[in-house]
From Swiss-Prot:
GO biological process: proteasome regulatory particle assembly
Region (Disordered): 106-142
InterPro entries for the chain: Nas2_N, PDZ_sf, PSMD9
Pfam families: Nas2_N
Family listed: Belongs to the proteasome subunit p27 family.
Ranges annotated as biased composition (Low complexity): 113-134
Function per UniProt: Acts as a chaperone during the assembly of the 26S proteasome, specifically of the base subcomplex of the 19S regulatory complex (RC).
Gene3D superfamilies named among the record's database cross-references: 2.30.42.10, 6.10.140.1710
One cellular component term from this protein's GO annotations in UniProt: nucleus
Name this polypeptide is given: Probable 26S proteasome non-ATPase regulatory subunit 9
Presence of the UniProt keyword Chaperone in the record: yes
Length: 262
């Protein structure tokens, strides 16, 4: 009797493991589908929507090297490119998780005798016939779920450099100013100014927030006279890091440029 009880307990444990793994895999598959849909939407925006002007890797400058005047569109394209990079990383991790849990499922004792490449778990409770006075709980493995293990989906490879979301831009640079010497140009999109930024989530930027970020930049400039401030920005398809040293010069202010919130 003890052996029978032990076998039943082991069977129940195996069934629980299968149920847990099946639930995890279902959730991961839904996540993978959501990522694929979002990626498709972003790629459509960059390839055939408003973003096709610049596309996935297009330059934000014209043939003569001048920045494009379409600043609002540039911001949206930058956001799309940044989000695609995040999706790529998330997608790779989800695929690793799916592979891990599928392997764990296939190693479970109850599943070793199953040769199908798809699986499903359905809980059913059946009552014995009139010739049997005992009730039994039966676990049936029948109609398979559409989780294929024979072929693994390939990760989506999109080469996009990860950068922060720009929150201010350079609208004017005075010749001979500290900003000019720091190689700042009109149209530069700044995503880090000293301790402000970088930001990688849209909830961290926006109309009101960007105005607050601009005020923080003004404070940093006032408190950094003759001290280097690290700035990171995007110009066309290039990511540039430079040092700006606020100081007194022949013009107005300490940096000689006009910075506006996006």
């Amino acid at each position: 009797m003890t052996d029978i009880n032990n076998k039943n307990n082991n069977s129940d444990h195996s069934i629980t493991v299968i149920e847990d793994e099946a639930s995890i895999i279902k959730t991961l598959m839904v996540t993978r589908g959501d990522l694929e849909k979002e990626l498709e939407s972003l790629m459509n925006f960059l390839k055939s929507g408003d973003g096709k002007t610049f596309g996935l890797k297009g330059s934000f400058t014209d043939s003569e090297g001048y920045p494009s005047p379409h600043l609002e569109l540039i911001i949206e394209v930058k956001k799309a490119r940044s989000r695609i990079a995040h999706i790529q990383n998330d997608y790779k991790q989800v695929m690793k998780d799916i592979e891990f849990h599928l392997e764990k499922l296939h190693k479970s004792p109850t599943n070793k005798n199953q040769s199908s490449s798809t699986f499903s778990i359905n809980n059913t409770t059946s009552t014995s016939n009139n010739n049997n006075n005992n009730n039994e709980d039966e676990m049936k493995i029948d109609k398979p779920l559409t989780v294929e293990t024979e072929t693994k989906p390939k990760p989506i490879e999109v080469e996009v450099e990860k950068v922060g979301i720009p929150f201010v831009y350079i609208d004017l640079v005075s010749e001979g100013s500290p900003s000019d010497k720091a190689n700042l140009k009109k149209g530069d999109l700044i995503f880090q100014f000293g301790t402000v930024g970088p930001f990688f989530e849209e909830r961290q930027v926006g109309d009101n927030l960007n105005s607050n970020h601009l005020q923080s930049i003004a404070t940093i400039v006032r408190n950094s006279e003759n001290k280097a401030i690290q700035i990171k920005l995007s110009r066309g398809t290039s990511i540039i890091s430079t040092s700006l040293i606020p100081r007194k010069w022949s013009g107005q202010g300490l940096i000689g440029c006009l910075i506006k919130p996006i």
